[in-house]
Swiss-Prot record:
Pathway note: Sulfur metabolism; hydrogen sulfide biosynthesis; sulfite from sulfate: step 1/3
Encoding gene (name): sat
Entry protein name: Sulfate adenylyltransferase
Family statement: Belongs to the sulfate adenylyltransferase family.
EC number(s) stated in the UniProt entry for this protein: 2.7.7.4
Length: 410
């Protein structure tokens, strides 16, 4: 019997919505006959997360009561904790053409593929600004990429249970790293792990990430380096490059069999504290008992305080999650200490510290600069330098307060 933390929800069982075998073949044929609802890249990635059971216990895209409950008090209509709305929008003409309980095919527009079907049980409109203020803590569509996506949603939300018929390109393009929750749980069980810490990544690992990871390795049975292979914002490093960079780091600087690397298909929302909670929910579904929450988790720009994503775990209803946050303070290289340290372990001043950030790594390398040796391992830097050298078009990367340390610790 598994010793891992059970999945999220009342039933404490994974709820994958991805069809297999004869049911899959039949649904694929049926989908060809249905009205088509186009999905954005975020909606498509959410559908795949539903399919693999990462969004257990959801059975589809949310209706109005769940949307409102999640925005206002982190709970769905049935009382189950959930931090961010998972919704599907359609333009009014498409929505008007769909009858109640009619089945529709869900099209991933970017990849021109039908990923699933949905029985439309509800159609409703939302206050987009209310969602943005609740989830992102801002309505700044010009500066915040997550807000911009919500404000660009179509006029009507469609809700109902889904059946997923494809995981898109993820299983083939990322075949050595992409995992479903059931697959990760099987790997953890085979190793006899019970206490597993997840390290959320959307950047290649620099020395601060490595430091966080090794703290977890010291106190847990194992570490799950779980990186996003879904869509990021412009200027972020692509998943295949990150996978390669993490591989060389784990191979050269971690004890064998203490770390598993995995990938998941969600798209970043950059919702900071609320997204940290979503990361916690689906990491619990993957079998992780803990989530490492460091500085500026899932943030963008200066919209959130550096530790707001840690504080929010203290504000949610008691018992909402079985997974626990592993909260870690500012980490940096201290020249006086002679290595990596944190605010809790280093007594020295700012002048003695080199703050490390993914943004700084990307900016320096994209401009052809040399990173200080304290920033990242040479094997990792080599992978990243090769990537940036091959770019035909350079992307401007702006530094923000959380990347430079010029923020007040709230």
């Amino acid at each position: 019997m598994s010793k891992l933390v059970p999945p999220h929800g009342k039933e404490k069982k994974l709820k994958p919505l991805l069809l297999e075998g004869a049911a899959l073949a039949a649904e694929k044929e049926k989908a060809k006959t249905l009205k088509v609802v186009p999905m954005t890249s975020r909606e498509a990635s959410d559908l795949i997360m539903l399919g693999i059971g990462a969004f257990t216990p959801l059975d589809g895209f949310m209706g109005y009561a769940d949307w409102k409950g999640v925005c206002d008090k982190y709970t769905m209509a049935d009382g189950v904790f959930w931090p961010i709305p998972i919704t599907l929008s359609a333009d009014k003409a498409v929505a008007d053409s769909i009858g109640k309980n009619e089945e529709v095919a869900l099209l991933d527009v970017e990849n021109n593929e039908i990923l699933g079907t949905m029985k439309v049980t509800e159609k409703y409109t939302i206050d987009k600004e209310h969602e943005c203020k609740s989830v992102f803590w801002t309505n700044d569509a010009a500066g915040h990429p997550g807000v911009a996506k919500v404000m660009a949603q179509k006029e009507v939300n469609l809700a109902g249970p889904v059946k997923v018929i494809s995981e898109s390109f993820y299983p083939t393009q990322f075949k050595n790293v992409y995992q479903r929750p059931a697959e990760a749980r099987k790997l953890f069980d085979e190793k006899g792990w019970r206490r597993v810490a997840a390290l959320q990544l959307r950047n290649p690992m620099h020395r601060s990430h490595e430091f966080l990871a090794k703290i977890a390795v010291e106190v847990m049975d194992g570490l799950y380096i779980h990186q996003l292979v879904g869509k990021l914002k412009e200027g972020d490093i692509p998943a295949d490059v990150r996978v390669k960079a993490i591989d060389v780091l784990v191979e050269n600087y971690f004890v064998k069999d203490t770390v598993i690397q995995g990938g998941y298909p969600a798209e970043m929302r950059y919702a900071g504290p609320r997204e940290a909670l979503l990361h916690a929910v689906f990491r619990q579904n993957y079998g992780c008992s803990h989530l490492i929450v460091g500085r500026d988790h899932a943030g963008v720009g200066d919209y959130y305080g550096p530790f707001d994503a840690q504080k929010i775990f203290d504000d949610i209803p008691e018992g909402a999650l079985l997974l626990q946050p592993l909260k870690i303070d500012w980490t940096f290289h201290c020249f006086k200490c002679g290595g990596m340290a944190s605010m809790r372990t280093c007594p020295h001043g700012k002048a003695d510290r080199l703050l490390l950030s993914g943004t700084m790594v990307r900016k320096t390398l994209s401009e052809g600069g040399e990173l200080p040796k304290e920033f990242s391992r040479p094997e990792v830097v080599k992978v990243l330098q090769e990537y940036y050298a091959g770019l035909e078009e350079k992307v401007e990367i702006k530094l923000h307060g959380a990347a430079t340390g010029d923020v007040k610790k709230k």
